[in-house]
Amino acid sequence: MDQPVASNQQKQTLNSEQRTPSDGLPLSVYMITYNNGVTIERALQSVADWADEVIVVDSYSTDGAQDIIPRYTEKLYQFETKDLREKYQYAHDQCINPWTLFIDADEWLMDDIKKEISTIIRGTPSCDGYIASRRNMYLGREIKHGGWYPDREIRLYRREKGRWEGGLHAKVTVDGTVGTLKHFYMHTPYADIAHQIRTIDRYSEAFAEDLRSSGRRFHLVNLITRPVYRFFRDYILKRGFLDGTPGFIIVVSTMYYVFMKYAKLWEIEMKEKKQFRDRF
């Protein structure tokens, strides 16, 4: 099976004018991935027989995801960058249909939201983009409180009206009117607690680098107070305690994530100071 493959050094991108959509639902679904072999098949299964086009942008996965993707789409691209916004925008740029929808490799769509989206696209849409709500499943339980709820963002939008902005927590912005979908899509962020810890380690490092590159400096008060604030906000004010043991694990792991991103910012600054001293 031929696969469109691109890298940030060698972008073999087909011009959208050279490609034409099929007679299916005029929707391009795209996702980015890296080592999501545990979850990506469910994500692909939920959209492969529904949308006209499914695009996946990988970063040279090594966990088997790269073998799963071609079973559901020929449009697999390889693209490496530390800039999450750039990777999402690259995936967006491969889309050819007038409407685009992005999902992550650990998310999937149920029939009700697919029917709603199909009705919008095949009808006369009143908006240029639509916010969708996400239902988060964690350790066998749907999380309905705390820092993970509510969880809403623009997911469906006209291709020519949307663009990606931001850094590590990049989001789509739409130049036009934005509505809200009635139905939810599903999300299982972690296969288990070990997977969660690995993800926290990766994201806290990326966040610390993003803070440093934007000129932010380490302050001890952030390391001390911000994790405590997150506990108070998410567990008490947002009633994370109502989600039982999973809710408590979530808030403690969130505190750990906040602590580690500022600890790693401090570590980056210490390495910079050492490099500066070693020059003399």
Locations of the language-model features?
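Catalytic-site signature of metal-activated, phosphate-bearing donor transferases
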Residues: 86-92, 99-103, 110-272, 279-280
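Conserved donor nucleotide-binding strand/loop of the catalytic core
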Residues: 66-96
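A conserved acidic beta->alpha catalytic loop
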Residues: 46, 50, 58-67, 81, ...
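Active-site acidic short loop of glycosyltransferases
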Residues: 24, 74, 95-98, 126
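Short, conserved active-site loop motifs that form the nucleotide-linked donor/cofactor pocket
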Residues: 27, 74-75, 178
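Conserved beta-strand positions in the Rossmann-like core of class I SAM-dependent methyltransferases
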Residues: 55
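N-proximal low-complexity "stem/linker" segments adjacent to membrane-targeting elements
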Residues: 1-46
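Acidic helix N-cap motif at the loop->helix transition within catalytic regions
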Residues: 38-41, 63-72, 112-113
